[in-house]
Amino acid sequence: MNRTRRLRLVLCTLLCVLLCSCQTLLPANEKAQVEELLRAPKLSGDYGALQTALNDWLGESAQLKYPIQGELLSPFVLQDLDGDGQQDAAVLYTTAQTANVCVAILQRDDAGSWQVRQSVEGLAETVENVSLAQLQDTDSCQLVVGYTAAQNDHYLAVYSYQDGTLSTILEQQYEQYLVENITGGSSQDLILMSTQEDGSVQIELLTADREGSFRQVAVNGLSADKFSGCASVAAGAGADGRHYLVLDGWTGISGNNLASVLLCYDENSQQMVPATRISSQRLYNVSLRNVPTLVSRDLDGDGIVEIPTQPD
């Protein structure tokens, strides 16, 4: 029995020695391969070149910031932003010296290498979503970034890149936003939803001129008597060819139910007004539902928004 125990002890000791010294037993080239595998993966293609160019410009390694929701879930946005026919790149990142997310614009030089042109600091430490919009009546494209702060406050920034300069043309707090052509013009509009101190929901419609300045086209409020906040917003076309806005608002005694409001843009008054195809009260009654995740959306991709109703 004692010999068996001693044999086991010797075997365990030898095994520990082998495990502890396994690294020293590896040839130098194999050790290098192991170390390479343990490193963080490097991006390839344009993404890798953009990351390298940004790090070289910063003099340190940037931490890429990924949007947490939306259609664009990459920290890299490749698009012709200034309308010159050449592809530009926007990169979302932070560094050890910045508290908020930063936006860098890069372009290719004559040799085809990416170079940082400018960087601006954003509005918060988290990127909620990113989208591209054509808010101006030009060939340029704007970058729309939604930020979320630590207190769960939401801030929207619209960036324009023109003549080699990155400008922030809008900074505003919001709860929901939508980029759509509501007014029927040649460019898209920006619709912002927010809840006021009295509990009412404010709908703000903004359009941009050729110089990039936003003007307030319409402001509407949803009564605090019925709604306590904005859950979602969607836009689509109607059978009459007009553009409609569907707002889902929190309602009910508990504030956990949803009901919908249908609005359209009236060119004469230049306001968002209730649609006449169905009365506001009737739509409220038929769309009142107790499923908070059942929001209005274009389910079949035909450009028409479907509004859920509560079954009898």
Where are the model-predicted features located?
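Sec-dependent N-terminal signal peptides of Gram-positive bacterial secreted proteins and lipoproteins
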Residues: 6-26
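Beta-propeller-forming repeat regions
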Residues: 22-312
